[in-house]
Amino acid sequence: MINQTAKKILKALSFDGVEVEAFRHMADLKRLDPMKIFYKKVDEKIYNGSHAVPIRIFFPSEKSFRESEEKKHDIQDKKLLLFIHGGGWVTESIDNYERICARLANATGQYVVAVEYRLAPEDKFPAGLEDCYAVAKAVYSGDFMLNIRPENITLIGDSAGGNLCAALSLMARDRGEFMPNRQILIYPATYNDYTENSPFVSVKENGSDYLLTAGKMQDYIDLYARNEEDKKNPYFAPYIAVSYTHLRAHETR
């Protein structure tokens, strides 16, 4: 239960409308969070056609970093989290999620690879998804500095990142180039309609007064889509896929 004081504050901050630049500046404030744990990172790029997709690799320990550099150790049996950040396909970055990814690596003992996919509205669907797919394909196929067995790789993403994890898994199944074994989808945005026409009771009951409003969600959807036809594409909204056969097990939080 939310106490009454907190509820009043949330209600005051719950408004519709997405101001792209203002929201991006607010998201950047995450960088002020001080890090008090060891972490080592390396920035690399993976190409999606002619576009270089920045990625950031987080190492769980100094030893794991040395092993990857020296290439004297077989790291295929190590584990890796391929992390896709949230932000409504419009805000956030691997810089803003650095603390989360570093803590994930530290807490799990796994490598973490974060993807800097292109954002809407400058680059609408499916640009960001194709960036994530290109990175996933390289990581799962071993065409990458960390040669980890595919069965030891987990896709993980929150909100819009959860959407992109689910969508690229559908895309991977359909294209037949690789297949993720595991997904962790953290409150994934998998549908295409947060208006009064939404079939979900939760949108009607909780679509206001809780900071992220249904109106904001719909604005993010509209900023991401090029047109109404995009919204009918299961790669845009994985919930509407006709079939989920031949997809591996996933976990939703």
Predicted regions and their residues:
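A glycine/proline-hinged amphipathic helix-loop "lid/cap" segment
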Residues: M1-S61, E69
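Short beta-strand element of the alpha/beta-hydrolase
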Residues: K78-H85
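Short substrate-entry loop that stabilizes the transition state in hydrolases
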Residues: G87-C101, A105-T108
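Catalytic nucleophile-loop/oxyanion-hole region of alpha/beta-hydrolase
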Residues: S93-I94, I100, A114-N152
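Primarily recognizes the serine-hydrolase "nucleophile elbow" in alpha/beta-hydrolase
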Residues: G142-M145, E151-S198
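Hydrolase active-site cap/lid region
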Residues: D174-E228
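Active-site nucleophile elbow and catalytic-triad environment of alpha/beta-hydrolase enzymes
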Residues: L223-V242
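Conserved small/polar residues in nucleotide/adenosyl-binding loops
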Residues: T245-T252
